[in-house]
A protein has these predicted regions:
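Perimembrane helix-loop-helix junctions
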Residues: 5, 233, 239, 266-300, ...
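Transmembrane helical bundles and short interhelical boundary loops of multi-pass, membrane-embedded
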Residues: 291, 370-379, 476-561
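Transmembrane-helix signature of polytopic, membrane-embedded enzymes
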Residues: 159-162, 183-206, 244, 478-479
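Membrane-interface transmembrane helices that cradle and orient dolichyl/undecaprenyl
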Residues: 191, 230-248, 256, 278-280
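Membrane-interface alpha helices of multi-pass inner-membrane proteins
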Residues: 245-261, 266-269, 301
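Interfacial juxtamembrane loops and adjacent helix segments
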Residues: 71-168, 327-334, 342, 353-373
Length: 561
């Protein structure tokens, strides 16, 4: 009796120690993850104090969509008759523009950066009948993200229209941060080892283009946040929550589709990922089929109104301007085959994937500093090659014959299924980019596909990268991925602090740069506060390091107990 009692007590102590370590590790993870999300948001003051209004890609078009909804309370139809509302003209011509954006609103009186700083800004007093309004080509997009922005624009458009732009930009950053919270939860399952997990999350939070893509007036932030949330909810599903998580994932993916058509690439991720996650957790086949069918049906019901509206107005459910133009020009198959044959693949791969562009200087398309760009190119290629080798090694280990009695732990099966979901997200997003490149090449004679279209899948690519490196060595994965995150910080700071002010202010005089930038920003983002903004950004990174030190000490103390 005494021996049995002693064994039971020891067992309880052992189980309690394991639970204590798990709880301590989870607390440490959420501390560091929270600090990294704060570091993500802490980049906003400096970046937004530099980034001019309408320098975001197609930003005046996206604001025009919002103003159209505000004026008419109807969804704009993509056609030659749908024009950018004149309500935004006073704000547009009061600001300088990039060449790409300025050419479109030149008839309104808009000036380039160089002309703007050397000539008085035009006024809105010009007779409105003497010029035409640009076509609202962003009417190709679904309305959800813009509908969320309408209250901000409506409240501020009369007295603080410039403030409305920065309020919408800030809201978009907060939406992306919410998506990052769910991704942090999914990382606990995808990356069981703490250090590589932190390195992956740092990559995402510190990636320059991931931030730039959402720090503008556009529909990308909501599409990205809901897309990442949907995939993360799939990864977090288990036997008990499969249906609930599947339905929430379907709702998130539907919201992503209602925001931007890049969300269409996530439909197969849901249909394939949900049964895969359930199968890894031992869910019976019958229940897998039922849950997948229910989730797919809910997704269809949520998206059906958008597709019916699109089909009624365009005769199609994919309504990108390239697809509509291609269909209007006649037979499609021959043009697509010719486009596929003549598409310039090397520049496309270089721009989108290897090495890709981790930083893009707004609609002016400012290039990265050459040394940093070269270093990033070599570093990224080496990491991809090493991760590919590690992935092959991991698969060979998994396929190696083992004794029948040996079973794979449930947590490893769940992680493997989660990695398959990550791979599906990356693969189908890449296929979507290729489709867009082929179609746009057929219509315009060149690919119009941009690297920021990949941003929803980017976090899951980083997971695959780190797990491939982990298969070689866990410490190698942590150091290599952490080094890339540090390089991202250098690229981002140099671009924001050096490249952008010089280009947008059209001068090499540092004092004049910030003075000019202050004149086209709200007072709260004055260039006079730039040092405070820089300290805020760097201070957030210091807090992340302090959090890592604390987590490391906490882990050692827990292990010692």
């Amino acid at each position: 009796m005494t021996d049995d009692s002693t064994v039971s007590e020891r067992s309880d102590v052992g189980v309690g120690a394991v639970i204590s370590r798990e709880q301590s590790g989870s607390r440490a993870w959420w501390l560091v993850a929270g600090l990294l999300i704060i570091a993500f948001l802490a980049r906003a003051p400096l970046y937004l104090s530099v980034f001019p209004p309408f320098e975001g890609w197609d930003e005046y078009q996206h604001l025009g969509y919002i103003a159209y909804l505000d004026q008419t309370s109807t969804i704009p139809v993509f056609s030659t008759a749908t024009r950018v509302p004149l309500a935004i003209r006073p704000l547009v011509i009061a600001m300088p523009h990039s060449r790409w954006g300025g050419d479109q609103v030149r008839d309104w009186g808009a000036l380039s950066y160089g002309d703007f700083w050397n000539a008085p800004a035009p006024t809105a007093a010009t007779d409105r009948g003497s010029f035409s309004s640009p076509r609202l080509y962003q009417a190709q997009h679904p309305p959800l993200a813009y509908a969320l922005d309408v209250p901000i624009w409506h409240a501020l458009k009369r007295k603080h229209p410039l403030g409305a732009i920065y309020a919408i930009r800030t809201m978009n950053l907060l939406l992306a941060a919410i998506g990052l919270v769910l991704f942090a939860g999914a990382l606990e399952r995808l990356m069981p080892v703490f250090a590589p997990r932190v390195a992956v999350f740092a990559l995402v939070c510190l990636h320059p283009l991931f931030f730039q893509n959402v720090a503008r007036v556009a529909n990308d932030a909501l599409a990205l946040a809901t897309g990442i949330a949907g995939i993360s909810l799939l990864v977090l599903a288990d036997r008990r929550t499969l249906l609930t998580q599947g339905l929430m994932a379907a709702a998130c993916i539907a919201a992503s589709i209602w925001s931007k058509q890049t969300g269409l690439t996530l439909i197969p991720v849901l249909v394939l990922g949900l049964p895969l996650i359930g199968w890894a957790d031992g869910v019976p086949a019958g229940r897998l089929c039922r849950v997948t069918a229910i989730a797919a049906l809910v997704l269809l019901l949520l998206v059906a109104p958008l597709w019916l509206w699109s089909y009624r107005h365009y005769g199609a459910i994919i309504t990108t301007q390239e697809s509509l133009q291609l269909a209007a020009d006649g037979p499609v198959a021959g043009k697509l085959l010719s486009s596929l044959e003549h598409l310039r693949w090397p520049p496309l791969i270089d721009t989108l994937f290897v090495p890709g562009r981790p930083w893009v200087g707004g609609w002016s398309f400012l290039p990265m500093q050459k040394s940093l760009a070269d270093l990033y190119g070599w570093y990224w290629r080496i990491l991809l090659a090493a991760a590919a080798v590690g992935g092959v090694v991991a698969m060979l280990r998994r396929w190696r014959p083992v004794e029948p009695v040996v079973s794979v732990p449930r947590v490893l099966s769940q992680a493997a299924a989660g990695l398959a979901v990550c791979a599906a997200a990356v693969i189908f997003t890449v296929l979507g980019l290729i489709h867009h490149a082929v179609v746009s090449n057929a219509v315009f004679g060149q690919s119009m596909t941009n690297p920021w279209y990949f941003m929803t899948a980017l976090p899951f690519l980083f997971v695959l990268l780190a797990r491939g490196l982990e298969a070689i060595n866990s410490r190698l994965a942590t150091v290599a991925v952490g080094g890339l995150a540090a390089l991202f910080v250098a690229i981002d700071l140099h671009g924001t602090w050096v490249e952008m002010p010089r280009a947008y202010a059209s001068t090499t005089d540092a004092a004049l740069q910030w003075s000019r930038l202050a004149s086209i920003h709200p007072a709260i983002l004055s260039g006079d506060l730039r040092w405070l903004f820089l300290v805020t950004q760097l201070g957030a990174l210091v807090l992340v390091v302090a959090g890592l030190v604390y987590a490391s000490r906490s882990a050692r103390d827990t292990t010692a107990q």
